[in-house]
Amino acid sequence: MIVKTRAVVLREIKYRDQSKILTLYTREFGRLACILKGGRNPKNRLSGIFSAGNVLDIVLYRKPEREVQLISDGSLVSCPMVPGPDIERFGVLYRIIDLVRLTTEHDGRSPRLFSLLESTLLELNRERVAYRTLYAWFLLRFISLQGFAPELCRCVFSGREIAADAAGGPRGELLFVMNPGGLALPGTACTDGRNVRPILPEAADLLAALSRTSTAESAAGGSGIPEGSAALFCGTLLQEYCRHHLEHTGGQKNLAVISQLLAE
């Protein structure tokens, strides 16, 4: 059956002399393994567009019983090379597509996840984007779709409102608890140090702001908060939080290298 769908390229590997095996995340079918015959032949008009991180409209010869689907056509929608190559954009890009690839099942359709992924990458591929803030927003939305949204308004132990308590005392005395997930006031419970991370007030404020940010476009604009170390911290924290709650977030070495690049 010939079908059309929008897709994000999650991974590409060489196959034989001139072809590619691709891992795609598609709007209609979820994650698929596909082959692009002649995809590495410079004379093939499709050879340059099926690259990791690209958003495409594609045509497939799809058979549900077949493990690898055949790509017959495609057109580019968005590419991280436009407006130009950028190490920070690429760092965020590969974190995002690796996370989706490693945490989704074959043929596991999720329109909400595809919408999140597509909208994030479309913003990521624009100029003057708050990359770190956008990445933290994506992680917060992603983990919420998995059913592990952290509590950012009330203390996970006492139930008291974080903003009200912080206003009445010294700032900086907050904790982020991996399980149960969310913010906690100091002294509310005896916690395992491996399960808790201290969090500065500006980072807690950013998390709260991102939880109220409904679109990737708004997050890419910084959600009204200047891009800085708080955004980097939130991205790293939420990445660890995702890893804590999900079973298949591999790629530890790759993520560590990219984290170092983004910190420089």
UniProtKB/Swiss-Prot annotation:
Similarity section: Belongs to the RecO family.
Respond yes or no to whether keyword DNA repair is given for this record.
yes
Instruction: List UniProt keywords, sorted A-Z.
Output: DNA damage, DNA recombination, DNA repair
Which biological processes are named by the entry's GO terms? DNA recombination; double-strand break repair
Asked whether the UniProt record includes DNA repair among its keywords, one would answer yes
Q: Name one GO cellular component term.
A: bacterial nucleoid
Recorded hits in PANTHER family, A to Z, give: DNA REPAIR PROTEIN RECO
User: Which InterPro entries does the record associate with it?
Assistant: ARFGAP/RecO, DNA_rep/recomb_RecO_N, NA-bd_OB-fold, RecO, RecO_C
Q: Which NCBIfam families match?
A: reco
Identify the coding gene.
Answer: recO
* Coiled coil start-end: none
What Pfam families would the database entry show? RecO_C, RecO_N
- Relate the protein's function as given in its record: Involved in DNA repair and RecF pathway recombination.
| Protein name (record) | DNA repair protein RecO
